[in-house]
């Protein structure tokens, strides 16, 4: 009863798993961080000074993020250069909460938690496609 058992070396298994990762995930060594919104209230307007920087950190179209924020706070607004201008007075706390909600719904993969995602359209439906695990999750259309 002397069967030969072939145990895999952990390091070899780890190397094999690493080789299977997509190229864009292999080279992602930094922690995912979104810069905090720099909110200024001027009269009856709220200005998010670093709006485009935030959208770029999330790897999303600034217009998509703006559309979400405007719907969430029920107001009108525009993009001017690298900043967003909203009609009305909104606290930095409220803006930060809406950014977190956007991250949860349209950026972070609900399957593996990776921020390496993109929004794709198949027919009439929109999906959040994860570059790390390959999951496709249906999302609401804005």
UniProtKB/Swiss-Prot annotation:
GO terms for molecular function: translation initiation factor activity. SUPFAM superfamilies: Translation initiation factor 2 beta, aIF2beta, N-terminal domain, Zinc-binding domain of translation initiation factor 2 beta. InterPro entries: IF2/IF5, TIF2_bsu_arc, Transl_init_fac_IF2/IF5_dom, Transl_init_fac_IF2/IF5_N, Transl_init_fac_IF2/IF5_Zn-bd. Keywords: Initiation factor, Protein biosynthesis. It holds the Pfam family eIF-5_eIF-2B. It comes from the Archaea. Gene3D superfamilies: 3.30.30.170. eIF-2 functions in the early steps of protein synthesis by forming a ternary complex with GTP and initiator tRNA. Belongs to the eIF-2-beta/eIF-5 family. NCBIfam families: aIF-2beta, PRK03988.1. This is Translation initiation factor 2 subunit beta. It comes from Thermococcus kodakarensis (strain ATCC BAA-918 / JCM 12380 / KOD1).
